[in-house]
């Protein structure tokens, strides 16, 4: 079992600006300056230095926090200028020595998290009117160029030395792991033959050629670089756009600070617990209370005043942290049981009020955040079974936004009792899309369009039989069969190969068309993960293993 990261102190994903070691953020009206100034001694794990603005998971945890806080705490920002605080280098990408000494699981989780952060930058540009500009004031290599590719525009310093490059294939025997190849051809629309040349040219490309090949949007001489980049940023910030309504007063994201128990993390609205012997975990999400519903039904100003304590924001921040904990600190957990608790009617009332206010900038950010957390669940390599049964005195609350958990799960078991109900809201109809753009309801009923059309616009609660007939339930069980049938399903799932299940689930969850984002996770990431375990990369004589050493790699020349 690949469990080395668990022998280290557990990774915590919560941070705040007072704890940043690697990023500097400043503000000038609608323009934010985000400088990457990585502390070489600030690695998350011992054994490597973060030289040349290279990054590890700790650097990216801070970046993810910056991106999210810009959206919630600084809605006045229209442009984010991303540059380097280190002379002559923008970013050297992921730290190669960190990758070389890491387990396969650590590399995979690291790349997945960095991919999600880059996607969140693009999401901010698309839906929060925060345009990211990369000001590559130095060498921009590998993951550094991939970071720039996540920005809407890229500007390169023309000084005879600064270049953009993706040297992973020629130097390391791996792929650019953070979306580079996909964004090169799908986003920047670089011709694929030119992309082939670029991706096998270790030194990359500079100046006019980089601009001619559309690898960057412009090149400026060193003497004018800062001036020209800021001129462009000011032009974007001044461009007239139709902003969402609502006074642009930021909402501070305070800590969520779970209570830690021996086998659990207890949040206000979420509980994560685990059983290592059974290799299972449970995530319980409690629905909104009557008081929570009263807040959202009071309108835009009341929702904004609730700030980070708004149920929809707080609960999904807690769920996000729980998912990241499972991914990184609990590698031996293979099956996650998703449960909800509360009043499904209150969830529907909550969703209706939130949907009615969705044109307010803060509500838009809350909904976008909910969507990103649910996509994190979709992309998590664990089996998920949603269990809609009565636990203690609590009723299941799989309705509206919490029904998304059941629709995201690989299976949904529902207890057939009169008091158990599920329901749909406007949020199930595209407000919380998957990474490839479909709603989970549309993905669930992709092969049954008549059932899908019948559910569109349907509101209110339905009993277990009606939900089953509508195609929302995998298995409907009565009280007599529930305990035995779910126990056997859980035991069977836990006995199967985790590798095979990861591949199977990734193929079955994302029906329908692909887009740039889904290609990054389904194609680029899958190939990268395979290459990571091949001897040509990570064997004793592989290119990644020997990077920085005097020996040359020895390849197995057989194509697979």
Regions found by a protein language model. Give the residues of each.
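Conserved hydrophobic packing residues within short motifs/helices of P-loop NTPase cores
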Residues: 80-81, 133
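Proline/glycine-anchored alpha-helix kink/cap motifs
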Residues: 125, 372-375, 442
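CoA-thioester-processing core
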Residues: 141-196, 393, 399-454
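Hydrophobic, small-residue-rich alpha-helical packing segments that form membrane-like cores
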Residues: 93, 98-105, 109, 113-131, ...
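C-terminal alpha-helix plus adjacent terminal tail
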Residues: 1-61, 65-78, 84-92, 98, ...
């Amino acid at each position: 079992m690949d469990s080395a990261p668990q022998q280290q102190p557990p990774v915590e994903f919560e941070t705040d600006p007072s704890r940043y070691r690697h990023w500097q953020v400043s503000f000038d009206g609608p323009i934010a300056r985000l400088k990457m100034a990585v502390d070489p001694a600030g690695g998350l794990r011992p054994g490597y230095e973060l030289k040349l603005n290279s990054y590890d998971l700790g650097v990216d945890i801070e970046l993810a926090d910056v991106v999210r806080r810009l959206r919630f705490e600084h809605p006045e920002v229209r442009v984010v200028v991303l540059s380097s605080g280190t002379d002559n280098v923008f970013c050297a990408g992921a730290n190669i020595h960190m990758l070389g000494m890491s387990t396969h699981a650590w590399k995979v989780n690291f790349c997945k998290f960095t991919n999600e952060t880059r996607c969140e930058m693009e999401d901010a540009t698309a839906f929060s009117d925060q345009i990211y500009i990369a000001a590559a004031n130095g060498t921009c290599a590998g993951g550094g160029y991939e970071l720039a590719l996540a920005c809407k525009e890229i500007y390169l310093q023309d000084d005879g030395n600064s270049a953009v490059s993706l040297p992973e294939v020629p130097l390391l025997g791996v792929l650019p792991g953070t979306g580079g190849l996909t964004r090169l051809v799908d986003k920047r629309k670089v011709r694929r033959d030119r992309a082939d040349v670029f991706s096998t040219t270790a030194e990359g490309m500079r100046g006019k050629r980089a601009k001619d090949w559309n690898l960057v949007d412009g090149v400026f001489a060193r003497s004018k670089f800062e001036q020209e980049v800021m001129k462009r940023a000011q032009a974007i910030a001044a461009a007239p756009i139709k902003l969402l309504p609502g006074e642009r007063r930021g909402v501070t994201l305070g800590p969520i600070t779970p209570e830690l128990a021996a086998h659990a993390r207890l949040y206000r609205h979420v509980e994560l617990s685990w059983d290592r012997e059974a290799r299972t975990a449970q995530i319980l999400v409690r629905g909104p209370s009557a008081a929570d519903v009263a807040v959202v039904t009071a309108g835009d100003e009341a929702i904004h005043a609730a700030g980070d304590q708004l149920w929809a924001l707080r609960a999904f921040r807690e769920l996000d942290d729980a998912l990241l904990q499972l991914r990184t600190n609990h590698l031996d957990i293979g099956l996650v049981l998703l449960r909800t608790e509360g009043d499904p009617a209150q969830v529907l009332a909550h969703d209706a009020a939130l949907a009615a206010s969705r044109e307010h900038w803060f509500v838009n950010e809350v909904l976008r955040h909910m969507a990103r957390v649910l996509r994190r669940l979709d992309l998590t390599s664990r089996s998920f079974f949603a269990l809609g049964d009565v636990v203690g005195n609590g009723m299941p609350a799989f309705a509206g936004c919490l029904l998304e958990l059941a629709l995201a799960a690989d299976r949904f078991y529902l207890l057939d009792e009169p008091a158990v109900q599920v329901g749909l809201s406007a949020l199930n109809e595209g407000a919380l899309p998957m990474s490839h753009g479909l709603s989970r309801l549309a993905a669930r009923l992709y092969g049954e369009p008549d059932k899908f059309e019948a559910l569109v616009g349907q509101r209110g609660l339905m009993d277990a039989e009606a939900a089953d007939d509508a195609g929302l339930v995998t298995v409907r069980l009565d009280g007599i069969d529930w305990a035995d049938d779910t126990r056997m399903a859980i035991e069977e799932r836990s006995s199967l190969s985790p590798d095979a299940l990861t591949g199977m689930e990734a193929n079955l969850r994302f029906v329908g068309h692909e887009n740039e984002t889904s290609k990054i996770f389904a194609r680029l990431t899958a190939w990268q993960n395979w290459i990571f375990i091949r001897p040509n990369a990570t064997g004793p004589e592989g290119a990644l293993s020997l990077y920085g050493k005097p020996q040359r790699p020895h390849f197995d020349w057989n194509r697979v």
